[in-house]
């Protein structure tokens, strides 16, 4: 199942970091597909949503399990880490992959 976590290239992570402020402007909740920047749409997400912690770009969903890319909100005190649910892995500054077992 590890293959379900998206592989993000250096170029993709740079593109995502560059447009993160656009996504972070949205209020909490689902971000409509019509508002997805090209860098997000290229990941072919199932859904994109905003929380107080940041933006989740869900690329895999099965029942309660979810995986994808996370862009933290720099205004939040949230610190993504590997030891929790969801767990986070750093891809580049300001860009993480995440996995939630539910």
Region locations from a protein language model:
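N-terminal export/targeting and maturation segments
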Residues: 4-52
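Short, solvent-exposed recognition patches
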Residues: 37-102
């Amino acid at each position: 199942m590890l293959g379900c976590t998206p592989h993000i290239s250096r170029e993709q992570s740079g593109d995502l970091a560059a447009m993160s402020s656009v996504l972070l402007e949205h209020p909490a909740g689902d971000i409509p597909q019509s508002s997805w920047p090209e860098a997000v749409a290229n990941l072919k997400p199932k859904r994109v949503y905003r929380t107080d912690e940041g933006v989740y770009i869900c690329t895999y969903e099965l029942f309660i399990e979810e995986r994808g890319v996370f862009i933290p909100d720099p205004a939040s005190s949230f610190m993504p880490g590997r030891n929790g649910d969801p767990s986070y892995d750093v891809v580049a500054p300001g860009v993480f992959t995440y996995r939630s077992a539910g």
